Amino acid sequence: MKPIVSILIFCALAVVIMGHPLDSGYGIPHIVEKLPNGQWCKTPGDDCSKSNECCKPKDPENYSGGCVAQWSGMHGKRINMCRICYLESSMC
């Protein structure tokens, strides 16, 4: 029983530290379009340097998107990632 509890605690801590891919808003509908430079916009969760590189949400009245600094457990530092979030959420 102890090993099972230890594994569950480890998994929970790993998710908290590294985050979850859905935290970036990947499941929220977004518009994938070509940018003026010929590249495709970056989807939520992708690395970015400017907000205009990121795909925009399909519902801009309720969702906001852009390039934000976010902690990466894999890199051990803050990195810029495209993100879409619900405006009413305290996480936005």
Swiss-Prot record:
Signal peptide limits: 1-19
Q: What is its main location?
A: secreted
The set of disulfide-linked cysteines is 41-55, 48-67, 54-82, 85-92
Q: How is expression of this protein distributed across tissues?
A: Expressed by the venom gland.
- Tell me yes or no: is Disulfide bond among this UniProt entry's keywords: yes
Q: Where in the cell is it found?
A: Secreted
Q: Does the keyword Disulfide bond apply?
A: yes
Would you list which residues are glycosylated?
62
Cellular component terms per the entry's GO annotation = extracellular region
What UniProt keywords are attached to this protein's entry?
Answer: Disulfide bond, Glycoprotein, Ion channel impairing toxin, Knottin, Neurotoxin, Secreted, Signal, Toxin
One Gene Ontology term of the molecular function aspect = toxin activity
The Swiss-Prot or TrEMBL record describes its family as follows: Belongs to the neurotoxin 21 family.
Comment, domains: The presence of a 'disulfide through disulfide knot' structurally defines this protein as a knottin.
According to its UniProt entry, the function of this protein is described as: Probable neurotoxin with ion channel impairing activity.
Q: What is the name of the protein in this document?
A: Toxin ICK-15
Higher taxonomy: Eukaryota, Metazoa, Ecdysozoa, Arthropoda, Chelicerata
